[in-house]
């Protein structure tokens, strides 16, 4: 199986320039599905820390790159929305956050903020033993007590070291959300109204106020809090 794909064919969320080289690295198996960006692309094309896949492999083999608190050895490992990228030797930490164009961007955060990651609950099920299993937007699972009140569309914050849930944000009117897809991707605001659609259609949500609000479908929204807006952080852009 090829390890490369044409740049023109990559998802719109990838932070790469499509009109330079013909090919780029293909994402390997892992979280985030097809939307995941290979780690080497962020290291090379966005941060400029390496010039080649070979240099990326060397850095990874020396445990100098952590993703959600774990050392990563595969340069093709998919990186996606709300992942935490840490470079302990450099003292640099980043959160993956969608920009207003819908492309994934790296937002600089401090070490404390880098100790946990946000996840949107996409499914909840009961597993043998009676615990509840929460499936997050990136495909990872978290076990919690069955009697805890977590619902799909809510968001949780997971500690990168203990893997425990340390915060819970309910999806409801008044919740702070960000759009992660569609024409309003990257925009942040409070849920003003949820218009429930009967049948299998998507619910429509109005975010913000009448003057500067927007309407989108429910699936495009993720509940966050003020610590995830990036208001006080610097965004790293790819070289284009």
UniProtKB/Swiss-Prot annotation:
Residues 37-99 form the S4 RNA-binding domain. InterPro entries: Rib_uL2_dom2 (IPR014722), Ribosomal_eS4 (IPR000876), Ribosomal_eS4_central_region (IPR013845), Ribosomal_eS4_central_sf (IPR038237), Ribosomal_eS4_N (IPR013843), Ribosomal_eS4_N_CS (IPR018199), S4_RNA-bd_sf (IPR036986). One of its GO terms (molecular function) is structural constituent of ribosome. Gene3D superfamilies: 2.30.30.30, 2.40.50.740, RNA-binding S4 domain. Transmembrane segments: none annotated. Keywords: Ribonucleoprotein, Ribosomal protein, RNA-binding, rRNA-binding. The keyword Nucleus does not apply. SUPFAM superfamilies: Alpha-L RNA-binding motif. One of its GO terms (cellular component) is cytosolic small ribosomal subunit. GO terms for biological process: translation. PROSITE patterns: RIBOSOMAL_S4E, S4. NCBIfam families: PRK04313.1. Belongs to the eukaryotic ribosomal protein eS4 family. HAMAP family: Ribosomal_eS4. This is Small ribosomal subunit protein eS4.
């Amino acid at each position: 199986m090829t390890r490369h794909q044409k740049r023109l064919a990559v998802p719109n969320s990838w932070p790469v320039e499509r009109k330079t080289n013909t090919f780029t690295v293909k994402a390997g198996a892992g979280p985030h599905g097809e939307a995941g960006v290979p780690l080497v692309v962020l290291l090379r094309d966005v941060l400029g820390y390496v010039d080649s896949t070979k240099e990326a492999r060397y850095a990874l083999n020396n445990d100098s790159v952590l993703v959600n608190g774990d050392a990563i050895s595969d340069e093709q490992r998919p990186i996606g929305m709300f992942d935490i990228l840490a470079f302990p030797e450099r003292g640099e930490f980043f959160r993956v956050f969608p920009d207003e164009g819908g492309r994934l961007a790296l937002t600089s955060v401090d070490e404390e903020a880098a100790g946990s990651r946000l996840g949107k609950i996409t499914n909840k099920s009961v597993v043998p033993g009676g615990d509840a299993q929460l499936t997050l937007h990136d495909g990872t699972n978290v076990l919690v007590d069955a009697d805890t009140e977590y619902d799909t569309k809510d968001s949780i914050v997971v500690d990168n070291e203990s893997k425990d849930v340390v915060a819970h944000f309910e999806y409801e009117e008044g919740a702070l959300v960000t759009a992660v897809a569609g024409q309003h991707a990257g925009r942040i605001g409070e849920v003003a109204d949820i218009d429930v659609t009967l049948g299998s259609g998507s619910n429509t949500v109005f975010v913000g106020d009448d003057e500067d609000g927007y309407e989108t479908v429910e699936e495009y929204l993720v509940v966050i809090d003020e610590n995830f807006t990036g208001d006080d952080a610097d965004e790293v852009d790819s070289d284009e």
